[in-house]
C-alpha cells in the first residue's frame, strides 16, 4: 500500500523544485544558497505577514532563502495556485538576495 505524502512534504517538494529550477539558471550565484521551509515567519514586520525571507551569507553561515508554509497555504486557493505562489515567493526572495528584479531571475515570473 503506497504511503500518502503529507501536505508539509508536498510543500517542501515545491520549494525544492523551484530552487532547482533557479539554480540551473543561476548556478554561480545560487550554488551555496540554502533553501528552507519554516511553518511561520518569526514575527510581524509591520507590513503584514511575510511569505518568505532571504538573508545574505555572514561568516560561515550561507545565504538562505526561507518560504513560510502556513501563510502561503492560507493564501493559495488551490494546489495549482499554491505551486505558483511558492515559485513566485522563491523567485522574489532570490531576486532580493541577488539585487535583481524577479523578472530577471525568472522571465516567467508572474505570468501564471
Task: Name these PLM-found stretches.
Residues 90:
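Active-site beta-strand/loop microenvironment that shapes enzyme catalytic pockets
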